[in-house]
Amino acid sequence: MTLFILTETSAGYALLKAKDKKLLKRDDLATEAATAEGVSNLVKLKSFQKFDSAAAALEEVASLVEGKVTPRLASLLDEIKDEKKVSLAVADPKLGNAIGKLPGLDIQLIADSTTADIYRAIREHLPTLIPGLLPQDMSTMSLGLSHSLARHKLKFSPDKIDTMIVQAIGLLDDLDKELNTYAMRVKEWYGWHFPELAKILNDNIAYARLVLKMGMRSNWETSDLAEILPEELEGPVKAAADRSMGTEISQDDLENIQALAEQVVGFAEYRQQLAGYLTARMNAIAPNLTALVGDLVGARLIAHAGSLTNLSKSPASTIQILGAEKALFRALKTKHDTPKYGLIYHASLIGQATGKNKGKMARVLAAKASLGIRVDALADWEDDATEEDKAALGTEARYNLERKLAAMEGKPLKPRGVAIAPNGASAQPKKFELNEARKYNADADALSSDEPKSKKDKKLIEEVSDEEMADADSDEEPAANGTKDDDSSDDSEEEKSKKHKSKKGKDAELEKLAERAGLSLKRYKRKLERGEITFDADGNPTAVSKKDLKKAKKEAKKASKGDEKKRKRSDDGEEVDNAEKKQKKKKKKGEE
């Protein structure tokens, strides 16, 4: 079988013919092809098609990189159509598959590792195989073609178009962190001079602008704060500046604080500009995705996937949990429930849903978003297509999802075209307002002197005295619960005095018994409760230790066990006697 070798160069296509049909199976191929003479003895030039210009060379090589067969290459391969039993060696397997699909070309393609040695030798000694090709010209053409190819990839790569979105959303997140850090530093720094301002003014940007406008708090009389603050806050700020308890600072300190405040204001203005730029880029590149989930969530999805093309290749289930990979793998490892949503959770449609409907909306929204992303990434729009036409799929899908969500939540359906806020209400533009910070409510303070006397004198822990149980023979009856009249108050006082006297008498008896036992009253009571006090025939108490009690319990257990064993032995002896009697009776019957 005749072997042909296809070689792509910066100058053109070369088709080489092997002199040995079993060239690729030789063991000494690497040593034979080490020199130019050895390569010339192994292969010879069959045909060579030169590129007409640098632009043509760029077009041909760009097609080869994508695995496409160009008309120029197809015409070169037509020269070996008529030959029988032909094999063709190709360096790129992707290109080999494309050549194999050409109609009317019955050849055996070889695109594996066996061709590596011969291709290495051909590239090293290419000028000796192609007549009229100088090594200097070859290197110049290779360098120019590589530069053109790199420029072409950077300019026309579809993955590079959305790089602006990836970088913009990353910068937006960084700006938010830096802006928050700088604003907190301004508040802490200027708070030494004017601490009351932070309690009145919540907005960080307005705070920084006020620092730049007023400077020292003593300038409150001459400062016009109407451009920064509304009327309801301007008065409290000036009043607080008049009676502020802050420390004095030097002019040098104020200049440094104002320099930092300028950075805060500058960052805030640039962040607003960057957010507008990101919205415009998202509407231009991914209009359907933006219509469904918003510009910020859509940009984060694209940044997480790497590019719009990579995101379009993902199924709806992947888009739904994109950004929650750590929770997903932890759930799979511990065999728990997997997360229902990732970055898509921050979309307004999911924010409007409540309870179990959040998971349902996340699933449906991810399915619609996957369709919209594929349209954004792969659709070829005409030049006269409007933005409404490009975003028609996303707009229609969002309208249907809003109606579905309203049906799930049991809410009235909104008219078409009405924007819906995350809380489910119709979104309307609001006037910018600066809310006053919450102040400390001094009226809610309560002093100990303000409390009623009964509450003040009341103890935290009340000791309830033990009441003596009345004897069954006694004629006294317990007092009934409920309201008492004035006439019964005297009787209750008498009863209390009687109980107090009886308690004193009982304590006196216990003291006498404790003295006989040689113990204190508290210890005697404790031992009496535990059962460690025994009385003899005369009624004299004696204290028993815990060890003696344990020994007595053990001896009682042993005695009970011994009785059980004796019973078992006696039962066993009776059974043996009965068995012997039965055997004797059987013997007598046998003798008879």
From Swiss-Prot:
Basic and acidic residues bias locations: 450-462, 505-515, 557-571
InterPro entries: Nop56/Nop58, NOP58/56_N, Nop_C, Nop_dom, Nop_dom_sf, NOSIC
One GO-annotated biological process of the protein: protein localization to nucleolus
Matches recorded under Pfam families: Nop (PF01798), NOP5NT (PF08156)
Record field: compositional bias (Acidic residues): 463-478
Main subcellular location of this protein, as a coarse class: nucleus
Alphabetized SMART domains for the sequence: NOSIC
GO terms for MF: snoRNA binding; snRNA binding
Ranges for region Disordered: 443-592
Biased composition (Basic residues): 582-592
Keyword Nucleus set for record: yes
Gene3D superfamilies from the UniProt entry: 1.10.287.4070, Nop domain
Function, in words: Required for pre-18S rRNA processing. May bind microtubules.
Name used for this protein in its record: Nucleolar protein 58
Organism: Aspergillus clavatus (strain ATCC 1007 / CBS 513.65 / DSM 816 / NCTC 3887 / NRRL 1 / QM 1276 / 107)
